[in-house]
A protein has these predicted regions:
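Hydrophobic positions on the alpha1 helix immediately C-terminal to the Walker A/P-loop
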Residues: 168
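A noncatalytic interaction/capping subdomain that flanks phosphate/NTP-handling catalytic cores
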Residues: 1-156, 161, 171-177, 184-270
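Conserved glycine(s) of the Walker
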Residues: 163-165
Length: 270
């Protein structure tokens, strides 16, 4: 039976479909607010009958996260290989995308069964790495940050792990709308910088699919006392980059990302 679903994140619509014995696609609950009926910008076909015979050679590897995922360039296509100690050295999932990441197939090593729920083709880390690749194609930036909307004003609290993003989200609970406490997307729209919530939260599970014009950026750090100091220019751009997810494997994507960071800090008070 054919199943399909569409999910929109930061004005990018992902169309998910597959042909299989069950339609019980296991989309995480956090995606429920992101379901939509729009025309897909990115089409993903999920396959649950084993991995394709694609050779994953060391010389074709363009990036290794040293964790669970690696990227390869094979015959002009980008291949995501996901591994886990649970399954040994061989990938448990492979995703193959065309040059612009608009079409892809996600292959799963474990076949589905009529009783089982199908694993989410947007399961971590593929969803977030794919978003980084898409944004690097002139679309925007994926930031390690908490995003808050307060009466139509967007506040971005950027920080790496343990810097206080989730704490900031909890402080704002009941005072403003939490877009996400850990992953925010920045995009240019109508001559302004906008920020968008994503499904990929940290410890705080309050998320929103909405976007809001970005008014201020705050770079979080621990200190003995509360305080604010203005950051501008190259330093602000470098701080934003250090708290983002840049496409380190893509020279053109990095050039766009660096330019976009400059553009953001030139348009928004930090």
């Amino acid at each position: 039976m054919r199943w399909q679903s569409t999910v929109e994140v930061a004005e990018i619509v992902f169309g998910l479909f597959g042909d299989c014995a069950t339609e019980a696609l296991s989309l995480d609950q956090i995606y429920s607010d992101f379901l939509c009926s729009g025309e897909p910008d990115v089409v993903l076909k999920a396959c649950y009958n084993g991995l394709p015979p694609i050779p994953l050679r060391d010389e074709d590897r363009i990036f290794d996260s040293q964790m669970v995922w690696s990227l390869y360039r094979v015959d002009g296509r980008t291949v995501f290989a996901l591994r886990s100690p649970v399954f040994g050295p061989q990938p448990y999932r492979i995703a193959v995308f065309d040059e612009d990441f608009r079409h892809g197939e996600v292959y799963n090593a474990l076949p589905e069964t009529p009783e089982s729920r199908l694993c989410n083709p947007l399961e971590y880390p593929l969803s977030e790495v794919l978003m980084v690749c898409l944004l690097a194609r002139g679309r925007g930036l994926h930031v390690h940050a908490c995003g808050i909307e307060d009466n139509g004003r967007g506040y971005l609290f950027a920080g790496n792990s343990t810097h206080g993003k989730t704490t900031m989200a909890r402080l704002w609970r009941g005072e403003g709308r939490i877009l996400n406490d850990d992953r925010i997307v920045l995009r240019a729209r109508d001559g302004r910088i906008w920020m968008y919530g994503t499904p990929w939260h940290g410890e705080c599970d309050s998320v929103s699919p909405d976007g809001v014009p970005l008014e201020h950026i705050f770079f979080l750090r621990h200190a003995e006392a509360d305080g604010l100091s203005r950051v501008t220019g190259t330093r602000a751009a470098a701080m934003l980059l250090a708290r983002s997810f840049p496409p380190l494997w893509d020279a053109d994507g990095m050039a766009f990302t660096l330019d976009f960071c400059d553009r953001v800090v030139g348009a928004v008070t930090c």
